[in-house]
A protein has these predicted regions:
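Active-site hotspot residues in diverse enzymes, especially metal/ion-binding acidic/histidine motifs
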Residues: 1-178
Length: 178
């Protein structure tokens, strides 16, 4: 997890999975695709604005973003990706695609919630941590449980290749296909 520790209302993996499945279905319908490989950047740029007229997507320079790879401002309904992350995500780099999906997770899960800053990570249970929730959402939308029948029996490397994610993400997410 990265970013600040922000305490949000608790969410289970099951509820995050449902939110990711609903979001993916809505985005696929608008973008007219249902492939296992989700074109996440195109979803953020072209499909999501059709579902939410107040939403905006921006790409900022490395100089402006600094160490932040992505930012989501729920009150302004904006997702921002750092330029190099955006470009690599378009090229299919798994880590950068996950960053884009992670930011979508913040947008979907945290737009209408009260947040508070934790004094330390020790004060947070993972299911109350906005970063864990967004990471979970990213894994669930890019490697969906709803398409687990296409993924069960595959090696983590095969899942990474099919879904366009890193080997680390595929290894972790594959534990939840059982």
């Amino acid at each position: 997890m990265s970013g600040n520790s922000i305490k949000v209302p608790p969410e289970s993996r099951k509820s995050i999975r449902a939110a990711a499945a609903f979001s993916r279905l809505a985005l696929e319908k608008v973008h007219k695709c249902d492939d296992l490989y989700l074109p996440i950047v195109q979803m953020l740029e072209f499909a999501l604005p059709k579902l939410d007229s107040e939403y905006s997507f921006e790409v900022w320079s490395v100089g402006r973003m600094g160490d932040n790879h992505g930012l989501t401002n729920p009150t302004e309904k904006t997702i921002i990706l750092r330029e190099d992350v955006y470009e690599k995500a378009l090229l299919g780099h798994g880590r950068d695609r996950m960053t884009a999906a992670h930011e979508l997770g913040h947008y979907v899960l945290h737009s209408d919630v009260d947040i508070s800053f934790a004094r330390s990570n020790e004060d947070l249970k993972c299911y109350e941590n906005s970063e864990w929730q967004a990471d979970c959402f990213g894994g669930e939308i890019l490697m969906p449980y709803t398409k687990k029948d296409l993924l069960i029996g595959k090696t983590p490397q095969e899942i990474a290749d099919l879904c366009g994610v890193s080997l680390k993400a595929a290894t972790y997410q594959s534990k939840f296909f059982r």
